[in-house]
From Swiss-Prot:
Keywords, sorted A to Z: Coiled coil, DNA-binding, Metal-binding, Nucleus, Zinc, Zinc-finger
Bias kind Basic and acidic residues: ranges: 102-118
Protein known as: THAP domain-containing protein 5
Subcellular location field: Nucleus
Organism: Gallus gallus (Chicken)
Matches recorded under PROSITE patterns: ZF_THAP (PS50950)
Annotated segments matching region Disordered: 84-118
One GO cellular component term noted in the UniProt record for this chain: nucleus
Coiled-coil annotated residue ranges, if any: 375-399
Length: 413
């Protein structure tokens, strides 16, 4: 039965360590000493209360002088009286003071709130074409993005800046191979993502030589506002080729060609992206360009952009499907190479012939086993006969010896 502290506003119980990692011990009331019991109850401010023999007080209510430590065990002195008791006000103060873990959790929540507060939707009402420029400052390269759009209704601007590769990995923005994702958004959204100093080696389909640079991509989710151009130094890009699949979805094709200082280039094709406008969820899509040098010819990298909330499930499902497919393929190769009867060139008749031969061999082995068992039994019978004959010969020898001994005794006499 667990032990509880009988003092009011005290929540200590047996098997539970204190807040400062101190061990608790419990002591019974001095029911046999009435004067001392009255002092205990008076200090507890419960004069009219009569405790039972099963009720205890914890060590937090006693001063260190009233405890006697022997062999690591704390014993209560016979004259000890509890003097430390908390009032309701102290209890409220104590509850208001959070533990370090709770403080850390609050700090983390505050940081997340601050990060979310930076992503405040800004409504813009524009009826005329407008040019918005975004410059990526770099000592070697400068990029200017000029977007001319006609906005007839309010837009939500959401910006997310990835400063280094760690932030790129922490935010879990994944480029998946040739897959179409359905992203639900209630309103058209203008999204801008800036990538700074991201090496091309982080992308699986990139070229071996790492080249770091800065790029900025603007993407529109509504087909009415997609007539925009992206211009970089020594680069050309466009956001075009948009079609409508159904009244509620839009397909966006985005191709960007990035040329570094050399003549080599990497062509990044953001293949297809389906955006469905529904009132249920609000998910952000971020387009990221990672250029790299190509040794011989420009390479084509096909990617589609995943929503942040669905990327983990999609990548895990793709990995499991790939692993299952590879395991099945390897199993077929092993069967076809190691076991001849699994080859597809062999006919059924040939297999049946092999099966009949195996059955005949099994019958021969069974007959040989019967013969060997019979031989073993005959040998066991012969061994038994020899043992009996040996016993008889030993008995005869004993009789002859006894006769000689009796003759010798008679001769001596």
């Amino acid at each position: 039965m667990p032990r509880y502290c009988a003092a009011s506003y005290c929540k200590n119980r047996g098997g539970q360590s204190a807040r400062d990692q101190r061990k608790l011990s419990f002591y019974p009331f001095p029911l046999h000493d009435k004067e001392r019991l009255e002092k205990w109850l008076r200090n507890m401010k419960r004069d009219a209360w009569t405790p039972s023999k099963h009720q205890l007080l914890c060590s937090d209510h006693f001063t260190p002088d009233s405890l006697d430590v022997r062999w690591g065990i704390r014993y209560l002195k016979h004259t000890a009286v509890p003097t430390i008791f908390s009032s309701p006000d102290d209890e409220e103060k104590g509850s208001s003071q959070n533990s370090p873990q709770e403080i850390r959790r609050e700090d983390q929540e505050e940081t997340t709130k601050n990060v979310e507060s930076k992503k405040v939707p800004v409504s813009l009402e524009l009826c005329t074409p407008k040019k918005s420029s975004v410059t990526a400052e770099n000592p070697d390269k400068k990029a200017e993005v000029i977007c001319s759009t006609v906005l007839s209704k309010s837009l939500q601007v959401q910006k997310l800046q990835l400063e280094n590769r760690e932030d790129f990995e922490a935010d879990s923005i994944i480029l998946d191979n040739s897959s179409q994702q359905h992203i639900h958004q209630p309103e058209p959204v203008l999204m801008a993502a800036a990538v700074q100093n991201v090496e091309a080696t982080d992308v699986h389909a990139s070229v071996e030589v790492p080249v770091s640079c800065t790029a900025t991509v603007l993407q529109f989710s509504d087909p009415d506002y997609l007539n925009s151009s992206l211009k970089l130094k020594n680069t050309l890009g466009s956001i075009t080729d948009y079609t409508l699949e159904n009244p509620n979805s839009h397909v966006v094709g985005c191709s960007v060609e990035v040329q570094p200082a050399t003549e080599n280039a990497v062509l990044v094709n953001a293949v297809t992206q389906t955006i469905e406008q529904l009132s249920g969820s609000e998910e952000s899509v971020i387009a990221i360009i990672v250029p790299a040098e190509s040794p011989k010819e420009p390479e084509i990298i096909n990617r589609s952009f995943l929503p942040i909330k669905q990327e983990f499930l999609d990548t895990e499902e793709a990995e499991t499907d790939n692993s299952l497919h590879m395991n099945a393929y390897n199993g077929l190769e092993i069967l076809q190479t190691e076991h001849s009867y699994c080859k597809q060139d062999i006919d059924r008749e040939h297999l049946w012939q092999k099966i009949s031969k195996l059955h005949s061999k099994i019958t021969l082995l069974e007959m040989q086993e019967v013969k060997t068992l019979g031989r073993l039994r005959s040998l066991e019978a012969l061994i038994g006969q020899l043992k009996q004959e040996n016993l008889l010969s030993e008995e005869k020898l004993k009789i002859v010896e006894n006769c000689f001994t009796t003759l010798e005794v008679t001769m001596i006499q």
